[in-house]
């Protein structure tokens, strides 16, 4: 009601309804704001937050595992490459010596037995990638003896 109105006129219902409309509208606006900031969606937010945390945790775990594997793989490569290269040089010397004797059958047999997958097979190495036999690789030692016997003839 306005200050000029004494309430005896027909505008009273309009004023009251206008005030009621404004009050109702304020309540609706308040409810709309409450809906936005209210607790109705907390469960959904908690679930999505938990999903995001789980996803990031899983990705972090995978990244850590991958990094550790790459690191240990690199360390293993760094430690083992010189040993493998040394064995490769010895195999190359054996094959080079054998080919000079003009015995194709002997050369082919040596080439088959001294194949890289045979020479570096895990049965010849321990967990630390050291040769199992004390000093020599069995197959390489065999062919070194063959070459030495050929040279002594």
Swiss-Prot record:
UniProt keyword annotation of Cytoplasm present: yes
Coiled coil regions in record: none
Keyword Nucleus: yes
Region described as deca-GX3 motif: 60-100
Keywords: Cytoplasm, Nucleus
Any one of the GO CC terms: nucleus
Superkingdom, taxonomy of origin: Eukaryota
Subcellular location: Cytoplasm; Nucleus
GO BP annotations listed: protein maturation
Function: The complex LTO1:YAE1 may function as a target specific adapter that probably recruits apo-RPLI1 to the cytosolic iron-sulfur protein assembly (CIA) complex machinery. May be required for biogenesis of the large ribosomal subunit and initiation of translation.
Annotated family: Belongs to the YAE1 family.
Protein name (record): Protein YAE1
Organism from which the protein derives: Debaryomyces hansenii (strain ATCC 36239 / CBS 767 / BCRC 21394 / JCM 1990 / NBRC 0083 / IGC 2968)
Recorded name of the encoding gene: YAE1
């Amino acid at each position: 009601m306005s200050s000029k109105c004494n309430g005896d006129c027909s505008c009273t219902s309009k004023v009251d309804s206008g005030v009621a409309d404004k009050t109702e509208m304020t309540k609706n606006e308040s409810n709309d704001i409450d809906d936005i900031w209210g607790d109705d969606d907390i469960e959904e937010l908690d679930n999505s937050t938990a999903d995001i945390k789980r996803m990031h945790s899983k990705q972090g775990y995978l990244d850590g595992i991958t990094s550790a594997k790459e690191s240990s793989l690199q360390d293993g490569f760094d430690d083992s490459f010189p040993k493998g290269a040394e064995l490769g040089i010895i195999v190359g010397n054996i094959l080079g010596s054998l080919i000079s004797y003009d015995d194709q059958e002997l050369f082919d047999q040596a080439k088959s037995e001294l194949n890289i997958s045979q020479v570096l097979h895990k049965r010849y190495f321990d967990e630390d990638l050291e040769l199992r036999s004390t000093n020599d690789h069995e197959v390489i030692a065999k062919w070194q003896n063959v070459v030495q016997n050929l040279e002594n003839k």
